[in-house]
Structures are given as structure tokens and as C-alpha cells.
């Protein structure tokens, strides 16, 4: 992408800082990519230690991923509400929301972290973990999960910085955390510099230490950039009206994510019925095609910040046009990258496996992304735009109806009952994404969201 492409999208001073979609989006793209990498780095590096440790950490990460979704709802509300207040030049109120979001996410995440620490074993038993894997999984979940409130605070500070347009700062912190995490993993897995080989426990400590340092960096940067002083009195003073606004945006957003994750767990169960090869094919295919989603995710987050400001400044036409332009770019990029991946699909899958059956099936699934990913772009872009406008409930209702009323039934019908296998599952994904995408598009075109602004 070239910066010139996005010049016409520049936000014209609804606050002190002027920025374009491009200036917001490229750091977010790198940050999201690195967060995905950091989530997989522990597993990848532990594969050099033992297969059991990989399995144990993999199961623990499934629980941790659900916890992250629970933390994200405050961060989502923070981005929207602060952006709206800045757009309407209510800087004092924007600062108050920042304090409320830090305090609220601290209390919520601390409580969840405590539950995870003390209930680690029952939670792992619920996942069907074998006794052989329990010791490693317990250690990892208790250390990383017990300190997961640190990640919640990082997400909150990151949301605050992004709302003010400082997306590069959050990117650099994420880069630093990745470097520290990988370096620490090397030390504790391979026993470098005289350190003992600590395996899973060492990796858990390495991950947590990297996050602690990342949090400290975030606090320093927020203080420097927006003069947000870490006063306990201000952080723990819960401004009821601001908290209500955060929850009004955040809770529906979390509900949508939880609904999606739960529906995907059921889809995974359907695929498990097809056998281990089908599961392996699904993992390889989604690991490859996840790259397509990263572009849409970055564009949607940058768009959300801009639209939040436009809504706060009552620039509704500008907000409408910003969403539509972002949608067109996301559709074009999704289509182009899907076609490229289809052309080189066999080479890409060959990086993971030499199985002819897996390569053939995965190639078909990647070809189907040419239809799937543009539909997903509608949802990724417009849902975040609706949230930025304060219209958070509609996407949740439509998601539940489409995922559970269309996606899952079709997954069973085509994948299991009619015997189409993974191709049938992908057909259900296409149907779900396009039905929701069209509904989101109609909602945005209706401009009902103009009535939902919160600041």
C-alpha cells in the first residue's frame, strides 16, 4: 500500500492530532501480526523440548484465549468512547474515561486471574486433558493465567493510545515484548548462559516477564503522550456514567466474540468426527488464510478510531464515507490475496506437509476463500464501524441468529449429513459470513447508527 492512496481519508482536526487511515493502519497490522505470533511462539519453541509440552500448552492456550475475549470488552469500549469524546473536543471527559477503563479492567481481570489460578485443574479437566499432560498444563495456566490481569491492562493502555492516534507506540511495545519473550524462551528451553532447562514453567515465566515489562513501557508512554498520571485515587474512582457507556459498547462486543468462539468449538467437534486428518487440514488451511484476515482487521481498527472521532464531531457524512471507502479497500485486498494464495496454494501447504490428501483438500479450501474472505470483510469493517457509532447491539443479535441459525446447521448438513466433509464446513462459513455481511451493509446504509452516538 502507498500512503498517497489514503491521503483523502485524513481526519481534519476533530482533535489536536491529524492522521490518515494509512498512518493508523500499518502499525496496527504489524501489532496484530506480532500478537498472533507471540501467542504461537511458546508452542513453536516448546516443540523443540517435547511433544507433551506442546499439547499441554495448546490446551491451556484455549482457556487463555477465552479469557482474553472477556478482557477485551472494556478495551473495545475504551477505543470507541475516547475517540468520540476527542472528536467532540471533550478532552477532560476523554481522560476520565481512560481512568475508568484502567480501574474497571484491573478489578475485573484480577478477579478472573484469581479464579484461573485456583481453578486451573478443574478447568483443564473440563477440557478433557489427560493425567500425563496435567502437570505441565497446570503450571502454564497458573503462571500465565494467574498473571493475565497484566495482559488485560496492556490491552487497556493500548486502546487508550490508539484512541489518541499513537498506534506506532503500541506497535513498538509489542515488538519489544516479542523479542523479550523469544529471548527468554531460548534461555529456559535450551539452558543458555548457565540457566537450568525449565521447560514449560520457564516459558510461562518468560511470557509473563515480557508482559510485565511491556506494561511498564505502556504506562510510561501513556504518561508521556497524553499526560495520564497514574493516580490511585483517579484510577479507582468509578465514574458511573462513563462506566455505563463503556459497558454498553463493550458487553455486546464481548458477547459477539464469545458466540463466535463457542460456535467454532462446535464446528471443530464436527470436524473431529471426520478424523485426525480433517483436523490437521483445517489447522493448516486456517494458519495460511489467517494472513488475509490480518489486513481486514488492521483496516477495521483504524477505521473504528476515525469513525469514532467523526461521530463525536457530528460529522456523520464523513463517517459514512470513511466506512464505505475502508470496505472497498478491504474487499479488494481480500479478493487479491485470496486469488494469490489459491494460485500458490500447493506450495504454501507443502511447507507444512507432504501428504497428497491434505494438500488436495486444503487447496480446495483455500480456493473457496475467494468467495469467503470478501464476505468476511463486510463483517470485519462494518461491525467495527457500527460499534464506533455506538450501534453495538445489532451486530450481536445478527451474529447469534446467523452463526447458530445458519452457520452451525449448514455445517452439520453439508459437512456430516451429506458427506461433503471440510468443503461442506467451508460452505457453511461462506453462508454465515455473507448473510451477516449483507445485513451489516444494509444497517450501515440505513444510517440508523446516527441516533446511537454516545459522547
From Swiss-Prot:
Q: Where in the cell is it found?
A: Cell membrane
**InterPro entries with a match to the protein in the record:** MATE_fam, MdtK-like, YsiQ
A GO CC term assigned to this protein in UniProt: plasma membrane
Which positions carry the signal peptide feature in this UniProt record? Answer: none
Q: Name the residues that span the membrane.
A: 19-39, 63-83, 106-126, 140-160, 173-195, 200-222, 265-285, 288-308, 324-344, 348-368, 388-408, 410-430
Give the membrane topology, semicolon-separated if more than one: Multi-pass membrane protein
NCBIfam families referenced in this protein's UniProt entry, alphabetically? matE
Q: What is this protein called?
A: Uncharacterized transporter YisQ
Q: Which organism is it from?
A: Bacillus subtilis (strain 168)
Amino acid at each position: 500500500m502507498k500512503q498517497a492512496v489514503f491521503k483523502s481519508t485524513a481526519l481534519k482536526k476533530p482533535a489536536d492530532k491529524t492522521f490518515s487511515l494509512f498512518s493508523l493502519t500499518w502499525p496496527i497490522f504489524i501489532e496484530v501480526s506480532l500478537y498472533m505470533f507471540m501467542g504461537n511462539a511458546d508452542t513453536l519453541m516448546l516443540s523443540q523440548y517435547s511433544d507433551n509440552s506442546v499439547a499441554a500448552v495448546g490446551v491451556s492456550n484455549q482457556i487463555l484465549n477465552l479469557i482474553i475475549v472477556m478482557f477485551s470488552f472494556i478495551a473495545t469500549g475504551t477505543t470507541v468512547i475516547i475517540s468520540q469524546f476527542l472528536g467532540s473536543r471533550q478532552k477532560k471527559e476523554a481522560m476520565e474515561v481512560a481512568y475508568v477503563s484502567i480501574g474497571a479492567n484491573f478489578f475485573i481481570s484480577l478477579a478472573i486471574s484469581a479464579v484461573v489460578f485456583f481453578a486451573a485443574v478443574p478447568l483443564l479437566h473440563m477440557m478433557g486433558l489427560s493425567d500425563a499432560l496435567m502437570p505441565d498444563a497446570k503450571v502454564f495456566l497458573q503462571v500465565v493465567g494467574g498473571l493475565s490481569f497484566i495482559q488485560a491492562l496492556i490491552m487497556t493502555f493500548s486502546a487508550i493510545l490508539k484512541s489518541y492516534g499513537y498506534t506506532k507506540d503500541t506497535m513498538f511495545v509489542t515488538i519489544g515484548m516479542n523479542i523479550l519473550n523469544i529471548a527468554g524462551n531460548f534461555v529456559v528451553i535450551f539452558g543458555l548462559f548457565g540457566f537450568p532447562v525449565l521447560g514449560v514453567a520457564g516459558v510461562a515465566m518468560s511470557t509473563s516477564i515480557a508482559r510485565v515489562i511491556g506494561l511498564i513501557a505502556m504506562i510510561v508512554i501513556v504518561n508521556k503522550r497524553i499526560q495520564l498520571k497514574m493516580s490511585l485515587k483517579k484510577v479507582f474512582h468509578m465514574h458511573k456514567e462513563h462506566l455505563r457507556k463503556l459497558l454498553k459498547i463493550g458487553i455486546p462486543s464481548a458477547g459477539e466474540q464469545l458466540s463466535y468462539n463457542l460456535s467454532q468449538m462446535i464446528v471443530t467437534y464436527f470436524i473431529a468426527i471426520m478424523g485426525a486428518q480433517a483436523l490437521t487440514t483445517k489447522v493448516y488451511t486456517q494458519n495460511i488464510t489467517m494472513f488475509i484476515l490480518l489486513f481486514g482487521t488492521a483496516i477495521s481498527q483504524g477505521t473504528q478510531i476515525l469513525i469514532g472521532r467523526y461521530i463525536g464531531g457530528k460529522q456523520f457524512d464523513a463517517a459514512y464515507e470513511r466506512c464505505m471507502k475502508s470496505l472497498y479497500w478491504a474487499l479488494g485486498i481480500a479478493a487479491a490475496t485470496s486469488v494469490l494464495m489459491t494460485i500458490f496454494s500447493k506450495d504454501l501447504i507443502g511447507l507444512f506437509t507432504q501428504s497428497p490428501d491434505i494438500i488436495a483438500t486444503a487447496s480446495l479450501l483455500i480456493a473457496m476463500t475467494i468467495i469467503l474472505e470478501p464476505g468476511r470483510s463486510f463483517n470485519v469493517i462494518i461491525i467495527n464501524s457500527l460499534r464506533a457509532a455506538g450501534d453495538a447491539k445489532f451486530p450481536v443479535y445478527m451474529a447469534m441468529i446467523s452463526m447458530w441459525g445458519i452457520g452451525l446447521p449448514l455445517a452439520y448438513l453439508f459437512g456430516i449429513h451429506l458427506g461433503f466433509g471440510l468443503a461442506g464446513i467451508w460452505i457453511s462459513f461462506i453462508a454465515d459470513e455473507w448473510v451477516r455481511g449483507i445485513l451489516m451493509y444494509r444497517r450501515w446504509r440505513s444510517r440508523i447508527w446516527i441516533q446511537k452516538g454516545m459522547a
